[in-house]
Protein backbone atom coordinates (compact mmCIF):
# COMPACT_ATOMS: atom_id res chain seq x y z
CA UNK A 1 0.00 0.00 0.00
CA UNK A 2 3.02 2.22 -0.34
CA UNK A 3 3.19 2.72 -4.08
CA UNK A 4 1.62 5.61 -5.91
CA UNK A 5 0.52 5.39 -9.51
CA UNK A 6 0.89 8.10 -12.10
CA UNK A 7 -2.16 7.31 -14.13
CA UNK A 8 -2.19 7.31 -17.91
CA UNK A 9 -4.76 9.63 -19.42
CA UNK A 10 -6.83 8.09 -22.17
CA UNK A 11 -8.85 10.14 -24.59
CA UNK A 12 -9.99 7.72 -27.19
CA UNK A 13 -13.24 9.53 -26.68
CA UNK A 14 -11.60 10.25 -23.42
CA UNK A 15 -11.09 12.43 -20.47
CA UNK A 16 -8.22 12.56 -18.02
CA UNK A 17 -7.01 10.46 -15.18
CA UNK A 18 -5.00 11.62 -12.29
CA UNK A 19 -4.00 10.31 -8.98
CA UNK A 20 -1.14 9.06 -6.98
CA UNK A 21 -0.73 7.23 -3.77
CA UNK A 22 0.08 9.31 -0.70
CA UNK A 23 0.84 8.26 2.80
CA UNK A 24 0.67 10.49 5.81
CA UNK A 25 3.72 11.20 7.91
CA UNK A 26 1.58 11.78 10.98
CA UNK A 27 1.50 14.85 13.18
CA UNK A 28 1.67 15.90 16.77
CA UNK A 29 -2.10 16.10 17.19
CA UNK A 30 -2.29 12.53 18.48
CA UNK A 31 -5.04 11.53 16.03
CA UNK A 32 -3.13 9.10 13.84
CA UNK A 33 -3.47 5.38 14.31
CA UNK A 34 0.26 5.08 14.83
CA UNK A 35 0.12 7.56 17.73
CA UNK A 36 -2.47 5.40 19.42
CA UNK A 37 -0.20 2.38 19.28
CA UNK A 38 -2.40 0.55 16.80
CA UNK A 39 -1.06 -1.23 13.75
CA UNK A 40 -4.19 -0.59 11.68
CA UNK A 41 -3.90 1.15 8.32
CA UNK A 42 -6.48 3.77 7.36
CA UNK A 43 -7.05 4.05 3.62
CA UNK A 44 -9.02 6.39 1.36
CA UNK A 45 -12.12 4.94 -0.29
CA UNK A 46 -15.47 5.80 -1.85
CA UNK A 47 -18.76 4.28 -0.74
CA UNK A 48 -19.23 0.97 -2.62
CA UNK A 49 -21.95 1.06 -5.25
CA UNK A 50 -23.27 -2.38 -4.34
CA UNK A 51 -23.19 -4.87 -1.45
CA UNK A 52 -19.80 -6.55 -0.94
CA UNK A 53 -20.29 -9.55 -3.22
CA UNK A 54 -17.29 -10.47 -5.44
CA UNK A 55 -19.33 -11.07 -8.59
CA UNK A 56 -21.35 -7.86 -8.29
CA UNK A 57 -18.59 -5.27 -8.12
CA UNK A 58 -16.95 -3.38 -10.98
CA UNK A 59 -15.67 -0.28 -9.20
CA UNK A 60 -12.90 0.46 -6.73
CA UNK A 61 -15.09 1.45 -3.78
CA UNK A 62 -16.11 -2.17 -3.38
CA UNK A 63 -13.16 -3.67 -5.20
CA UNK A 64 -10.52 -2.61 -2.70
CA UNK A 65 -12.06 -4.25 0.37
CA UNK A 66 -13.17 -7.31 -1.63
CA UNK A 67 -9.62 -7.87 -2.86
CA UNK A 68 -8.44 -8.14 0.75
CA UNK A 69 -11.40 -10.23 1.93
CA UNK A 70 -11.20 -12.96 -0.72
CA UNK A 71 -8.38 -15.20 -1.95
CA UNK A 72 -8.72 -16.48 -5.50
CA UNK A 73 -6.99 -19.29 -7.38
CA UNK A 74 -4.03 -17.02 -8.10
CA UNK A 75 -2.80 -13.64 -6.90
CA UNK A 76 -0.65 -10.92 -8.43
CA UNK A 77 2.36 -9.09 -7.06
CA UNK A 78 3.00 -5.35 -7.49
CA UNK A 79 4.53 -5.96 -10.94
CA UNK A 80 1.59 -8.02 -12.16
CA UNK A 81 3.32 -11.38 -11.87
CA UNK A 82 0.93 -14.22 -11.04
CA UNK A 83 1.46 -16.98 -8.50
CA UNK A 84 -0.82 -19.66 -7.10
CA UNK A 85 -2.88 -18.66 -4.06
CA UNK A 86 -5.65 -21.20 -3.42
CA UNK A 87 -4.70 -23.21 -6.51
CA UNK A 88 -2.20 -26.04 -6.30
CA UNK A 89 -2.06 -26.15 -10.08
CA UNK A 90 -3.91 -24.88 -13.17
CA UNK A 91 -3.25 -26.90 -16.32
CA UNK A 92 -4.76 -26.55 -19.79
CA UNK A 93 -5.00 -28.90 -22.73
CA UNK A 94 -3.09 -28.09 -25.92
CA UNK A 95 -5.65 -25.69 -27.40
CA UNK A 96 -6.63 -24.03 -24.09
CA UNK A 97 -10.26 -25.18 -24.28
CA UNK A 98 -10.15 -27.19 -21.05
CA UNK A 99 -8.49 -26.46 -17.71
CA UNK A 100 -7.91 -28.82 -14.81
CA UNK A 101 -7.69 -26.99 -11.50
CA UNK A 102 -6.41 -28.52 -8.28
CA UNK A 103 -6.71 -26.77 -4.91
CA UNK A 104 -4.38 -26.66 -1.94
CA UNK A 105 -5.57 -28.43 1.18
CA UNK A 106 -6.52 -26.71 4.42
CA UNK A 107 -8.15 -23.52 3.17
CA UNK A 108 -11.13 -22.24 5.18
CA UNK A 109 -13.55 -19.35 5.08
CA UNK A 110 -13.66 -17.08 8.10
CA UNK A 111 -16.82 -18.86 9.29
CA UNK A 112 -14.76 -22.04 9.65
CA UNK A 113 -16.22 -23.91 6.67
CA UNK A 114 -13.81 -25.43 4.12
CA UNK A 115 -12.99 -23.95 0.73
CA UNK A 116 -13.74 -26.70 -1.79
CA UNK A 117 -13.97 -27.10 -5.54
CA UNK A 118 -17.72 -26.55 -5.25
CA UNK A 119 -17.06 -23.23 -3.49
CA UNK A 120 -15.67 -22.06 -6.83
CA UNK A 121 -18.05 -23.77 -9.27
CA UNK A 122 -21.21 -22.65 -7.44
CA UNK A 123 -19.89 -19.10 -7.06
CA UNK A 124 -18.95 -18.83 -10.73
CA UNK A 125 -22.30 -20.25 -11.84
CA UNK A 126 -24.20 -17.86 -9.58
CA UNK A 127 -22.35 -14.87 -11.03
CA UNK A 128 -22.79 -16.07 -14.61
CA UNK A 129 -26.53 -16.71 -14.18
CA UNK A 130 -28.53 -13.79 -15.60
CA UNK A 131 -31.31 -14.34 -13.06
CA UNK A 132 -28.95 -13.10 -10.35
CA UNK A 133 -28.08 -9.87 -12.25
CA UNK A 134 -24.42 -9.81 -11.25
CA UNK A 135 -22.19 -7.13 -12.79
CA UNK A 136 -19.34 -9.61 -13.29
CA UNK A 137 -21.37 -12.09 -15.32
CA UNK A 138 -19.57 -11.51 -18.63
CA UNK A 139 -16.24 -12.65 -17.19
CA UNK A 140 -17.59 -16.20 -17.43
CA UNK A 141 -18.75 -15.93 -21.05
CA UNK A 142 -16.06 -18.29 -22.37
CA UNK A 143 -17.20 -21.16 -20.12
CA UNK A 144 -19.36 -23.78 -21.83
CA UNK A 145 -23.05 -23.31 -21.09
CA UNK A 146 -22.83 -19.58 -20.37
CA UNK A 147 -25.31 -18.77 -23.15
CA UNK A 148 -27.90 -21.08 -21.56
CA UNK A 149 -27.80 -19.01 -18.38
CA UNK A 150 -28.57 -15.68 -20.05
CA UNK A 151 -32.37 -15.79 -20.30
CA UNK A 152 -33.16 -14.63 -16.79
CA UNK A 153 -36.93 -14.92 -17.22
CA UNK A 154 -36.64 -18.69 -17.67
CA UNK A 155 -34.15 -19.33 -14.87
CA UNK A 156 -34.42 -19.91 -11.13
CA UNK A 157 -30.93 -18.59 -10.36
CA UNK A 158 -29.34 -21.80 -9.09
CA UNK A 159 -28.61 -23.36 -12.49
CA UNK A 160 -24.96 -24.34 -12.94
CA UNK A 161 -22.55 -23.74 -15.80
CA UNK A 162 -22.35 -27.03 -17.69
CA UNK A 163 -18.65 -26.46 -18.38
CA UNK A 164 -17.78 -26.77 -14.69
CA UNK A 165 -17.34 -30.30 -13.33
CA UNK A 166 -16.34 -31.14 -9.75
CA UNK A 167 -13.94 -34.11 -9.58
CA UNK A 168 -13.54 -34.07 -5.80
CA UNK A 169 -13.26 -31.52 -2.99
CA UNK A 170 -9.88 -30.35 -4.29
CA UNK A 171 -10.23 -30.62 -8.05
CA UNK A 172 -12.54 -29.40 -10.80
CA UNK A 173 -12.41 -29.02 -14.57
CA UNK A 174 -13.44 -26.12 -16.78
CA UNK A 175 -14.61 -26.70 -20.37
CA UNK A 176 -14.64 -23.57 -22.52
CA UNK A 177 -16.70 -22.73 -25.60
CA UNK A 178 -13.58 -21.43 -27.35
CA UNK A 179 -9.86 -21.29 -26.86
CA UNK A 180 -8.89 -18.89 -24.07
CA UNK A 181 -5.18 -18.80 -23.25
CA UNK A 182 -5.72 -15.94 -20.79
CA UNK A 183 -8.15 -17.89 -18.63
CA UNK A 184 -5.44 -19.03 -16.20
CA UNK A 185 -4.66 -15.37 -15.50
CA UNK A 186 -8.25 -14.16 -15.60
CA UNK A 187 -9.15 -16.32 -12.58
CA UNK A 188 -7.16 -13.94 -10.38
CA UNK A 189 -9.92 -11.33 -10.70
CA UNK A 190 -12.26 -10.77 -7.75
CA UNK A 191 -15.33 -12.10 -9.62
CA UNK A 192 -13.69 -15.55 -9.60
CA UNK A 193 -13.51 -15.72 -5.80
CA UNK A 194 -15.04 -18.73 -4.02
CA UNK A 195 -18.13 -18.33 -1.86
CA UNK A 196 -19.20 -20.20 1.29
CA UNK A 197 -22.56 -21.96 1.59
CA UNK A 198 -23.82 -19.14 3.82
CA UNK A 199 -23.85 -16.84 0.80
CA UNK A 200 -26.40 -18.91 -1.12
CA UNK A 201 -28.72 -19.05 1.89
CA UNK A 202 -28.97 -15.25 2.12
CA UNK A 203 -27.02 -13.24 -0.51
CA UNK A 204 -28.47 -9.93 0.70
CA UNK A 205 -27.29 -10.41 4.28
CA UNK A 206 -23.95 -11.71 3.05
CA UNK A 207 -23.36 -8.54 1.03
CA UNK A 208 -23.60 -6.47 4.20
CA UNK A 209 -21.35 -8.80 6.20
CA UNK A 210 -19.22 -10.87 3.80
CA UNK A 211 -17.43 -14.07 4.77
CA UNK A 212 -14.22 -14.56 2.82
CA UNK A 213 -10.96 -16.49 2.80
CA UNK A 214 -8.49 -13.67 2.21
CA UNK A 215 -5.72 -12.04 4.25
CA UNK A 216 -8.30 -9.93 6.10
CA UNK A 217 -11.74 -10.65 7.50
CA UNK A 218 -14.75 -8.39 7.71
CA UNK A 219 -15.55 -6.59 10.96
CA UNK A 220 -18.03 -3.80 10.18
CA UNK A 221 -19.46 -1.47 7.55
CA UNK A 222 -20.76 1.91 8.62
CA UNK A 223 -22.26 3.09 5.33
CA UNK A 224 -20.89 6.36 3.94
CA UNK A 225 -18.35 6.40 6.76
CA UNK A 226 -15.99 3.42 6.88
CA UNK A 227 -15.40 -0.29 6.27
CA UNK A 228 -13.32 -2.06 8.91
CA UNK A 229 -11.27 -5.18 8.14
CA UNK A 230 -9.05 -7.06 10.59
CA UNK A 231 -6.20 -9.46 9.97
CA UNK A 232 -7.23 -13.03 9.22
CA UNK A 233 -4.83 -15.11 11.29
CA UNK A 234 -6.02 -18.31 9.56
CA UNK A 235 -5.11 -17.08 6.07
CA UNK A 236 -2.85 -19.62 4.31
CA UNK A 237 -1.82 -17.74 1.17
CA UNK A 238 0.98 -15.56 -0.17
CA UNK A 239 -0.49 -12.18 0.81
CA UNK A 240 -0.10 -12.39 4.58
CA UNK A 241 -1.04 -9.10 6.26
CA UNK A 242 1.82 -7.18 7.88
CA UNK A 243 -0.54 -5.13 10.04
CA UNK A 244 -3.52 -5.72 12.30
CA UNK A 245 -6.14 -4.47 9.89
CA UNK A 246 -7.27 -1.94 7.30
CA UNK A 247 -9.99 0.64 7.80
CA UNK A 248 -11.33 2.10 4.55
CA UNK A 249 -12.56 5.62 5.27
CA UNK A 250 -15.20 6.96 2.89
CA UNK A 251 -14.72 10.46 1.47
CA UNK A 252 -16.78 12.51 -0.95
CA UNK A 253 -14.12 15.20 -1.35
CA UNK A 254 -10.48 14.56 -2.18
CA UNK A 255 -9.55 17.81 -0.46
CA UNK A 256 -10.88 16.52 2.86
CA UNK A 257 -8.97 13.27 2.48
CA UNK A 258 -5.77 15.13 1.61
CA UNK A 259 -6.15 17.30 4.70
CA UNK A 260 -6.43 14.11 6.75
CA UNK A 261 -3.28 12.78 5.07
CA UNK A 262 -1.48 15.96 6.07
CA UNK A 263 -2.71 15.78 9.66
CA UNK A 264 -1.87 12.09 9.98
CA UNK A 265 -5.42 10.87 10.54
CA UNK A 266 -5.42 9.07 7.17
CA UNK A 267 -2.54 6.80 6.17
CA UNK A 268 -3.01 6.09 2.47
CA UNK A 269 -4.62 7.93 -0.45
CA UNK A 270 -4.26 7.02 -4.13
CA UNK A 271 -5.36 10.33 -5.62
CA UNK A 272 -4.38 13.96 -5.31
CA UNK A 273 -6.82 16.88 -5.38
CA UNK A 274 -6.17 19.29 -8.22
CA UNK A 275 -5.34 22.03 -5.73
CA UNK A 276 -2.37 19.99 -4.47
CA UNK A 277 -0.88 18.62 -7.69
CA UNK A 278 1.76 21.36 -7.74
CA UNK A 279 2.81 20.95 -4.14
CA UNK A 280 2.20 17.40 -2.92
CA UNK A 281 5.64 16.05 -3.84
CA UNK A 282 7.30 18.82 -1.82
CA UNK A 283 4.86 18.67 1.09
CA UNK A 284 6.79 17.60 4.20
CA UNK A 285 3.59 16.32 5.84
CA UNK A 286 3.09 13.55 3.26
CA UNK A 287 5.12 10.78 1.69
CA UNK A 288 4.46 10.92 -2.04
CA UNK A 289 5.21 8.35 -4.71
CA UNK A 290 4.70 9.17 -8.37
CA UNK A 291 5.33 6.51 -11.00
CA UNK A 292 3.73 5.28 -14.21
CA UNK A 293 0.77 3.03 -13.49
CA UNK A 294 -1.75 0.82 -15.25
CA UNK A 295 -4.95 2.84 -14.74
CA UNK A 296 -6.56 4.71 -17.61
CA UNK A 297 -9.44 7.17 -17.53
CA UNK A 298 -11.68 7.88 -20.47
CA UNK A 299 -15.19 8.93 -21.34
CA UNK A 300 -17.77 6.94 -23.23
CA UNK A 301 -20.10 8.31 -25.88
CA UNK A 302 -23.16 6.01 -26.19
CA UNK A 303 -23.39 4.24 -29.54
CA UNK A 304 -26.89 5.57 -30.22
CA UNK A 305 -26.47 9.14 -28.97
CA UNK A 306 -28.02 11.65 -31.40
CA UNK A 307 -25.42 13.05 -33.83
CA UNK A 308 -22.84 10.54 -32.52
CA UNK A 309 -24.35 7.25 -33.73
CA UNK A 310 -21.45 4.81 -33.97
CA UNK A 311 -22.57 3.20 -37.24
CA UNK A 312 -23.00 6.46 -39.18
CA UNK A 313 -20.63 8.74 -41.06
CA UNK A 314 -21.82 11.74 -39.06
CA UNK A 315 -21.23 9.96 -35.76
CA UNK A 316 -17.73 8.89 -36.74
CA UNK A 317 -16.80 12.41 -37.86
CA UNK A 318 -18.09 14.02 -34.67
CA UNK A 319 -16.34 11.49 -32.42
CA UNK A 320 -13.05 12.17 -34.20
CA UNK A 321 -13.60 15.91 -34.02
CA UNK A 322 -14.33 15.88 -30.29
CA UNK A 323 -11.26 13.76 -29.58
CA UNK A 324 -9.00 16.04 -31.62
CA UNK A 325 -10.49 19.12 -29.95
CA UNK A 326 -9.23 18.04 -26.51
CA UNK A 327 -5.80 19.38 -25.67
CA UNK A 328 -4.57 16.50 -23.54
CA UNK A 329 -1.02 17.78 -23.23
CA UNK A 330 -2.24 21.12 -21.93
CA UNK A 331 -4.63 19.52 -19.43
CA UNK A 332 -1.92 17.19 -18.14
CA UNK A 333 0.58 20.02 -17.83
CA UNK A 334 -1.54 22.89 -16.53
CA UNK A 335 -4.48 21.22 -14.78
CA UNK A 336 -2.79 18.08 -13.48
CA UNK A 337 0.63 19.69 -13.13
CA UNK A 338 2.43 16.70 -14.62
CA UNK A 339 0.74 14.04 -12.49
CA UNK A 340 -0.72 12.33 -15.55
CA UNK A 341 0.24 11.57 -19.13
CA UNK A 342 -1.93 11.53 -22.27
CA UNK A 343 -2.75 8.00 -23.34
CA UNK A 344 -1.74 6.78 -26.76
CA UNK A 345 -3.37 3.36 -26.50
CA UNK A 346 -6.41 1.74 -24.91
CA UNK A 347 -4.10 0.01 -22.43
CA UNK A 348 -1.20 1.38 -20.39
CA UNK A 349 2.59 1.46 -20.94
CA UNK A 350 2.91 -1.30 -18.33
CA UNK A 351 0.71 -3.71 -20.29
CA UNK A 352 2.33 -6.39 -22.49
CA UNK A 353 1.74 -5.47 -26.13
CA UNK A 354 1.32 -1.75 -25.48
CA UNK A 355 1.95 0.53 -28.46
CA UNK A 356 1.93 4.31 -28.77
CA UNK A 357 1.59 4.19 -32.55
CA UNK A 358 -1.34 1.90 -33.35
CA UNK A 359 -3.54 2.64 -36.35
CA UNK A 360 -5.87 5.54 -35.65
CA UNK A 361 -3.82 6.93 -32.76
CA UNK A 362 -3.80 10.26 -34.58
CA UNK A 363 -7.33 10.73 -33.27
CA UNK A 364 -5.79 11.09 -29.81
CA UNK A 365 -3.65 14.06 -30.85
CA UNK A 366 -4.79 17.66 -30.40
CA UNK A 367 -5.45 19.07 -33.87
CA UNK A 368 -7.60 22.19 -33.86
CA UNK A 369 -7.68 22.62 -37.64
CA UNK A 370 -8.58 19.01 -38.38
CA UNK A 371 -11.22 18.95 -35.62
CA UNK A 372 -12.99 21.95 -37.15
CA UNK A 373 -12.87 20.38 -40.61
CA UNK A 374 -14.40 17.12 -39.38
CA UNK A 375 -17.08 18.97 -37.42
CA UNK A 376 -17.99 20.97 -40.52
CA UNK A 377 -18.28 17.78 -42.59
CA UNK A 378 -20.60 16.33 -39.97
CA UNK A 379 -22.71 19.49 -40.02
CA UNK A 380 -23.09 19.12 -43.78
CA UNK A 381 -24.72 15.74 -43.14
CA UNK A 382 -26.90 16.81 -40.20
CA UNK A 383 -26.60 20.34 -38.78
CA UNK A 384 -25.72 20.84 -35.11
CA UNK A 385 -28.25 23.34 -33.75
CA UNK A 386 -28.39 25.61 -30.72
CA UNK A 387 -30.61 23.00 -29.05
CA UNK A 388 -27.90 20.34 -29.32
CA UNK A 389 -25.30 19.84 -26.62
CA UNK A 390 -22.77 17.14 -25.75
CA UNK A 391 -22.83 16.74 -21.97
CA UNK A 392 -20.16 14.99 -19.90
CA UNK A 393 -21.36 13.19 -16.77
CA UNK A 394 -18.96 12.43 -13.92
CA UNK A 395 -18.84 12.12 -10.15
CA UNK A 396 -17.86 15.41 -8.56
CA UNK A 397 -16.41 13.81 -5.44
CA UNK A 398 -13.29 12.31 -7.00
CA UNK A 399 -11.44 15.37 -8.23
CA UNK A 400 -12.92 15.15 -11.71
CA UNK A 401 -14.54 18.60 -11.70
CA UNK A 402 -11.44 20.50 -12.84
CA UNK A 403 -10.61 17.88 -15.45
CA UNK A 404 -14.01 17.86 -17.11
CA UNK A 405 -14.25 21.62 -16.93
CA UNK A 406 -10.98 21.73 -18.86
CA UNK A 407 -12.21 19.10 -21.33
CA UNK A 408 -15.42 21.01 -22.01
CA UNK A 409 -13.58 24.32 -22.35
CA UNK A 410 -11.13 22.80 -24.81
CA UNK A 411 -13.96 21.39 -26.95
CA UNK A 412 -15.91 24.66 -26.90
CA UNK A 413 -12.82 26.70 -27.77
CA UNK A 414 -12.30 24.59 -30.89
CA UNK A 415 -15.79 23.57 -32.03
CA UNK A 416 -17.80 26.53 -30.81
CA UNK A 417 -19.23 27.95 -27.61
CA UNK A 418 -21.95 25.82 -26.09
CA UNK A 419 -21.16 22.61 -27.97
CA UNK A 420 -20.23 20.82 -24.74
CA UNK A 421 -21.20 21.12 -21.07
CA UNK A 422 -20.51 19.35 -17.78
CA UNK A 423 -23.09 17.13 -16.07
CA UNK A 424 -21.80 16.40 -12.54
CA UNK A 425 -23.28 13.94 -10.04
CA UNK A 426 -22.63 14.64 -6.33
CA UNK A 427 -21.07 11.31 -5.37
CA UNK A 428 -19.49 8.29 -7.01
CA UNK A 429 -22.34 6.11 -5.78
CA UNK A 430 -24.96 8.43 -7.32
CA UNK A 431 -23.01 8.50 -10.55
CA UNK A 432 -22.42 4.76 -10.87
CA UNK A 433 -26.06 4.01 -10.08
CA UNK A 434 -27.16 6.38 -12.85
CA UNK A 435 -24.73 4.75 -15.30
CA UNK A 436 -25.74 1.20 -14.35
CA UNK A 437 -29.42 2.11 -14.65
CA UNK A 438 -28.73 3.73 -18.04
CA UNK A 439 -30.16 7.05 -16.91
CA UNK A 440 -27.21 9.16 -18.05
CA UNK A 441 -27.89 11.22 -21.15
CA UNK A 442 -24.78 12.12 -23.13
CA UNK A 443 -21.16 11.14 -22.63
CA UNK A 444 -20.02 9.80 -19.26
CA UNK A 445 -16.76 9.30 -17.42
CA UNK A 446 -15.36 5.81 -17.42
CA UNK A 447 -12.02 4.25 -16.74
CA UNK A 448 -10.25 1.00 -16.19
CA UNK A 449 -8.02 -0.41 -13.52
CA UNK A 450 -7.01 -3.82 -14.89
CA UNK A 451 -8.58 -6.83 -13.22
CA UNK A 452 -5.69 -8.98 -14.42
CA UNK A 453 -2.50 -8.08 -16.36
CA UNK A 454 -3.61 -8.53 -19.97
CA UNK A 455 -4.49 -6.22 -22.85
CA UNK A 456 -7.64 -8.31 -23.30
CA UNK A 457 -8.99 -6.99 -20.01
CA UNK A 458 -8.79 -3.38 -21.20
CA UNK A 459 -10.32 -4.13 -24.58
Residue ranges and their predicted role:
Residues 44-94, 211:
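N-terminal lobe/hinge region of extracytoplasmic solute-binding protein
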Residues 102, 119-122, 126-128, 132-196:
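Surface-exposed binding/hinge segments that line
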Residues 116-123, 169-175, 214-215, 243-245, ...:
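Alpha-helical secondary-structure segments
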Residues 376-450:
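Ligand/substrate-recognition segments at binding pockets and active sites
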